[in-house]
Regions:
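Rhodanese-like catalytic fold shared by cysteine-dependent sulfurtransferases
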Residues: 1-29, 36-69, 76-113
Length: 113
């Protein structure tokens, strides 16, 4: 369910389990907005990368019909990315609640970037 995003626009919180299921069945394109050093240390397999520090909504990868969901370390930067995307006219409001920390807490795998 959509609610006001603290950084502007709207936000919809998805659980790591919802995101994992959506990635597995091809409905979700996860975009990790953490910085390159964080990605090198650990990442979610299959996630695309676009650091928030260089975020450009016009340069988002082609989702090929999938829902774009933003992710970060804990869930703050992903909400900021959604707000930036909405401010540029894109209707992207989904993020993974808890970020990669929530993903790992749910017992899902990560890999070295």
């Amino acid at each position: 369910m959509s609610e006001p995003n603290p950084f502007g626009g709207r936000i919809t919180h998805l659980t790591p389990a919802e995101v994992k299921a959506g990635m597995e069945d091809g409905r979700i394109l996860l975009i990790d907005v953490r910085e390159p050093d964080e990605i090198r240390a650990e990442r979610i397999p299959g996630a695309a990368v676009m650091a928030l520090s260089a975020f450009d909504a016009a340069a988002l990868p082609d989702a090929q019909g999938k829902q774009i969901v933003f992710s970060c370390r804990s869930g703050q930067r992903s909400q900021r990315a959604a707000a930036i995307a909405q401010a540029s006219g894109q209707q992207l409001e989904q993020h993974m609640q808890g970020g990669i920390l929530g993903w790992k807490q749910a017992g899902f795998p990560t890999e070295r970037g």
